[in-house]
Amino acid sequence: MENTLLWLVILIPGWALSDGSETELDFTWHLSRIPQVVSENTIHLASPTFQADAGVVKATVCGIECQEELPAPSLSQLEESLSYETIFENGTRTLTRVKVQGLVLEPTRNSSVKGAHPRRRRQVYGTDSRFSILDKRFATNFPFNTAVKLSTGCSGTLVSPNHVLTAAHCVHDGKDYVKGSKKLRVGVLKMRNKGGRKKRRGSKRSRREAESAGQSQAHLRESTTQRPGKKSRRGPRVTQGRPSFQWTRVKSTHIPKGWVRGENGGLALDYDYALLELKRAHKQQHMELGVSPTITKLPGGRIHFSGFDNDRDEQLVYRFCSVSEESNDLLYQYCDAEAGSTGSGIYLRLKEPGQKNWKRKIVAVYSGHQWVDVHGVQKDYNVAVRITPLKYAQICLWIHGNAANCAYG
């Protein structure tokens, strides 16, 4: 089962090319110049009450069909939605207004694009296709070790040595910050030794593993692939006991104003993302951000993500699935998932321009099982928020503090 999972992860892009219907050029990261989101001014706001329930979206949200009926937003509306709140660990809160530069506005919203299969509903479809990552050879290596757990019950993804990308509703319900988010923590999965103890912090082995994280994928293939008919001398190396988390406090949280609504405003699902800044840097390898391509540019039309589903007893759970429909800002997809996995970073594996290497990048955030408005009727779907060029520019600004490092994506 372990080797099967490894080959699934490695060979999925190859499956997409095997029928000859798609070319290698289709599966390359195409970097292009993106608009800039620039901070204009910052004002202080009153401290929140932290009384919202974690992970609960209390209203029907505007989904793909609903968005098709709306006019394209103006530049001022985009700047309003991309302005953002920052909440600090001491409870203080600020609002930063932004300006968008270098954007060419579209006259109308793009219509949705459907995938190859009819859309289905519910969180888990028929046979559960999720994989629990129990072996430390996988769980502690890239890309699985980029998945983290939030103390509010959601998941997230490491996108820099100091930052975690997650869903906005994991820390804010649209009106107030959730209970426990004032002392928000992020847990990085650590595996126990055979004796049930965690590795000693600061050990030489831990430092070597952190320093060699960039080579982990190649090492993983080499150390786990066996020749047919040859038994492993080491035997199965399945984790002993329960997983353990190394917890780090969150220093600050950024949320787009498009998610923060007043008493009369509805929730804008396309802004359901947030960035957490950690109080201290982690030693894990992180996953870079990328601009979400269209369905036709996805190898096999598939996406991937890992998170900590509540029904798997804090196990790290991986899945991949097809995208059924997309709009400018949202994806409807088939991935089996349960509560706890929301906030996970959805990633693709495409080739670097002009190279033979495949590279994974985060292109969307899993918003979860949501009730969406479909022509006036409420329906439930598994939804993800795409990282558009503007959102890439905004998240990049949050990470780097300026737009200088965010010109291409």
Swiss-Prot record:
Keywords per UniProt: Disulfide bond, Glycoprotein, Secreted, Serine protease homolog, Signal
SS bond list: C154-C170
InterPro entries: Glutamyl_endopeptidase (IPR050966), Peptidase_S1_PA (IPR009003), Peptidase_S1_PA_chymotrypsin (IPR043504), Trypsin_dom (IPR001254), TRYPSIN_HIS (IPR018114)
Places the protein is found: Secreted
Induction entry: Expression is progesterone-dependent regulation prior to follicle rupture.
GO molecular function: serine-type endopeptidase activity
Signal peptide start-end: 1-20
Keyword Lipid biosynthesis: no
Biased composition (Basic residues): 188-207
Residue ranges, annotated region (Disordered): 188-247
Listed GO CC annotations: extracellular region; mitochondrion
Keyword Glycoprotein found: yes
Coiled coil: none
Peptidase S1 domain ranges (all copies): 124-404
Residues bearing carbohydrate: N90
Family: Belongs to the peptidase S1 family.
Official protein name in the record: Inactive serine protease 35
Source organism: Mus musculus
